[in-house]
Amino acid sequence: MLQRCGRRLLLALVGALLACLLVLTADPPPTPMPAERGRRALRSLAGSSGGAPASGSRAAVDPGVLTREVHSLSEYFSLLTRARRDADPPPGVASRQGDGHPRPPAEVLSPRDVFIAVKTTRKFHRARLDLLFETWISRHKEMTFIFTDGEDEALAKLTGNVVLTNCSSAHSRQALSCKMAVEYDRFIESGKKWFCHVDDDNYVNLRALLRLLASYPHTQDVYIGKPSLDRPIQATERISEHKVRPVHFWFATGGAGFCISRGLALKMGPWASGGHFMSTAERIRLPDDCTIGYIVEALLGVPLIRSGLFHSHLENLQQVPTTELHEQVTLSYGMFENKRNAVHIKGPFSVEADPSRFRSVHCHLYPDTPWCPRSAIF
């Protein structure tokens, strides 16, 4: 019996020894190379099973990166850094917001970077323009250009930036589009960063305007203003002599003013430069501000950024809070529902002396103006 137990023990020891030898001589499992680790890491960033990254992920990797061959760990980190950099906006550039309110500055902007076009007609030179030159234009003559249809020596003495458009003085869509065409061409020639159009019944708060425009890079596609409708306008686009089709788009009303970046304005060239703006306006048979919206939204696919900081006489201006006047980009005056329509502000002037309230607003924004009463209470 002892001999039998001894043989069993010997066989067990021999078997264990053979098993150890087999384990030692077998090839070890390959250690993942840095490249493989890099690919696995990139796949994990992209999501499980090669799926798309989660919406809003700032570390999302370009699918093209995943198909590249990674030859070293340093290359992997290089690709990862590049992917994160590409996913983030450039320094100082925030993602576009739709509310049209100022955001952190995207670029440094000065008054000489902005081209303000004021559309008017000869019969309103005294009734409307004199008020503008007395108030906001007096501080910003170098950046403000008057587009009119009639010569005026008195106006020429006030500023050298008077542009005779050779357009009709009628308030027709053809005449309005004619003036807008001249405005566009003069802006392109100026080389300035921003084009802003206003009417001769608008007050422009330059500080608020610069603060708003500085929120957007002028090289990007930016069309900002305030629509007068609560829905896109429906129009008929004439494709050929006998063929039309429906088209709808948003547009910023010219009565409140609007601004366009140079980057977008250059893209508008095929439909706006030279005599093209007039022919484009005829395709939809709508006025100038509608034609701008048609080119930008319907043809170029750039959405209007709607801003509540622009105001026209088509809205109830009494609802603009006095405490927020310094934030508004444009104001207006006129009639609304058969009543006098202007912002509500106490100011140093009576409603009879200052029916538009522009003088009171100007003294509120620029109390150092020589003709503003020093003891004014707002």
Swiss-Prot record:
The active site is at residue 289. The chain crosses the membrane at residues 9-29. Detected at 12.5 dpc in all tissues examined with the highest level observed in adult brain and spleen. Detected in the dental epithelium. Optimum temperature is 37 degrees Celsius. GO terms for molecular function: metal ion binding; O-fucosylpeptide 3-beta-N-acetylglucosaminyltransferase activity. Residues 1-8 are cytoplasmic. Its EC number is 2.4.1.222. Disulfide bonds join 167-178, 196-259, 363-372. The keyword Transmembrane applies. A soluble form may be derived from the membrane form by proteolytic processing. Mn(2+) binds at residues 201, 313. GO terms for biological process: compartment pattern specification; marginal zone B cell differentiation; negative regulation of Notch signaling pathway involved in somitogenesis; ovarian follicle development; positive regulation of meiotic cell cycle; positive regulation of Notch signaling pathway; regulation of Notch signaling pathway; regulation of somitogenesis. Belongs to the glycosyltransferase 31 family. This is Beta-1,3-N-acetylglucosaminyltransferase lunatic fringe. It comes from Mus musculus (Mouse).
